[in-house]
């Protein structure tokens, strides 16, 4: 009986001591968050996983953000939304040198995992880095280098990872989050291009998990995350500290340039000077040609991309693809051309009136463009029509002389 009592007393102590047993693993896993860079592809920052093993002298970085620039079909694949990225692994020193050369900081978060959990993650990363496993289809806001790193930590460690709320009560949209980085980096023209080509799927409000497609938001999520009821991050430090360079001030933003152009074209449109009218003929040809090209690109990306980011794009309501052929005959004074521009004028006014009701955030630089379209289509729609002279006419002359 005493033996049973002793066993019953020692049995729970065995599990308590096992649970309290310190991690004797020499593995160290950390998340690396890189600050935004000057180039568009680096504007949103970057994420990677660092694995260190002091006993074997291993200090490697696993990076899901590499792709092949030299692929001859890269542009065609990019247009279709087929962006093949890969997991690459290389030394931590090489990683730091790369970001030092780009003048970008690196923040490191040490993850508090058991020895078994760290080994599982390390093994999964090694398997994922094999040539037959390393490639994946990249989708900017749903499956990228940051979401891959998060999913490996959550799914491959075996730990029960929980994230606390990191977004405000009124959640931002994907476009709001993207704009934050573009504005901070002074990427005004890139912001316009993104807003023109990406449809209203980007205007959906993000969930807590979806916000972590951005490196800073994953870092913020890990700061307050738990793993098996304890803090997931034990320590946070600067692996590479570089002061960010503020973007240089410039007036040459899309809004300023297009607003100035709107004023100039508006004044010239009311001029009766022949040189001004000749200039406007050339301007209209180029302007509507560019609008038509933008419309063709919008519709093409909407139709052929396999993802959804370019679908349901309301910018097609003002950048009409039909402008492309019309641009070559814009100077002609024809009835059908007059009717076309009257229709364009009405459509442009309707788009401007419905601006705040469109379920897509339209870039503010589009407003002066709409003004230019409205002015030029109004004047083109009210030009005097040149009457055609019949090509074949028969002139009959009658003589007043009496017939003898």
Give residue spans per PLM region.
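Soluble extramembrane regions of membrane proteins in the secretory/endomembrane system
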Residues: 21-242
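Core alpha-helical transmembrane segments of integral membrane proteins
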Residues: 225-308
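Short, highly charged low-complexity linear segments
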Residues: 206-220, 252-256, 354-363, 381-388
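Bacterial Sec-dependent N-terminal signal peptides
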Residues: 1-22, 386-404
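Generic detector of multi-pass transmembrane helix bundles and their immediately adjacent loops
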Residues: 271, 282, 286-404
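Residue-level signal for alpha-helical transmembrane segments in multi-pass membrane proteins
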Residues: 11-18, 268, 301, 329
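A generic alpha-helix preference that emphasizes hydrophobic side chains
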Residues: 15-18, 45, 146, 293, ...
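Hydrophobic alpha-helical transmembrane segments
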Residues: 197-205, 231, 258-262, 288-291, ...
């Amino acid at each position: 009986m005493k033996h049973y009592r002793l066993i019953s007393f020692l049995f729970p102590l065995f599990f308590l001591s096992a649970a309290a047993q310190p991690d004797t693993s020499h593995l160290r896993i950390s998340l690396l968050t890189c600050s935004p860079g000057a180039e568009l592809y680096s504007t949103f920052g970057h994420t990677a996983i660092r694995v260190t093993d002091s006993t074997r002298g291993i200090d490697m970085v696993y990076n899901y953000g590499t792709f092949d620039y030299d692929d001859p079909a890269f542009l065609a694949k990019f247009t279709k939304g087929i962006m093949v990225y890969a997991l690459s692994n290389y030394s931590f020193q090489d990683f730091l040198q790369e970001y030092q050369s780009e003048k970008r900081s690196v923040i490191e978060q040490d993850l508090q995992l058991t020895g078994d959990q760290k080994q599982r993650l390390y093994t999964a990363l090694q398997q994922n880095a094999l040539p037959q496993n390393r490639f994946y289809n990249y989708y900017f806001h749903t499956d990228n280098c940051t979401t891959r790193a998060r999913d490996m930590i959550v799914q491959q460690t075996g730990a029960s990872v929980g994230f606390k709320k990191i977004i405000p009560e009124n959640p931002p949209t994907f476009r709001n989050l993207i704009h934050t980085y573009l504005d901070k980096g002074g990427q005004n023209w890139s912001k316009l291009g993104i807003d023109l080509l990406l449809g209203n799927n980007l205007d959906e409000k993000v969930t807590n998990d979806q916000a972590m497609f951005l490196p800073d938001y994953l870092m913020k999520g890990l700061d307050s995350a738990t793993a098996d009821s304890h803090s997931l991050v034990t320590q946070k430090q600067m692996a590479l500290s570089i002061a960010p360079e503020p973007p240089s001030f410039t007036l040459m933003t899309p809004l300023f340039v297009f607003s100035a152009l709107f004023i100039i074209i508006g004044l010239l449109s009311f001029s009766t000077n022949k040189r001004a009218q000749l200039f406007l003929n050339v301007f209209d040809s180029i302007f509507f040609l560019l609008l038509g090209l933008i419309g063709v690109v919008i519709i093409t990306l909407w139709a052929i991309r396999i993802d959804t980011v370019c679908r349901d794009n309301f910018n097609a309501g003002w950048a009409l693809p039909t402008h492309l052929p019309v641009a070559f005959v814009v100077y002609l004074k024809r009835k059908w051309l007059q009717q076309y521009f009257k229709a364009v004028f009405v459509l442009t006014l309707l788009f401007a009136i419905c601006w705040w009701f469109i379920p897509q955030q339209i870039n503010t630089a589009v407003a002066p463009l709409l003004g230019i379209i409205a002015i030029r289509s109004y004047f083109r729609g009210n030009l005097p029509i040149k009457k055609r002279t019949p090509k074949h006419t028969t002139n009959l002359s009658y003589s007043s002389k009496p017939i003898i």
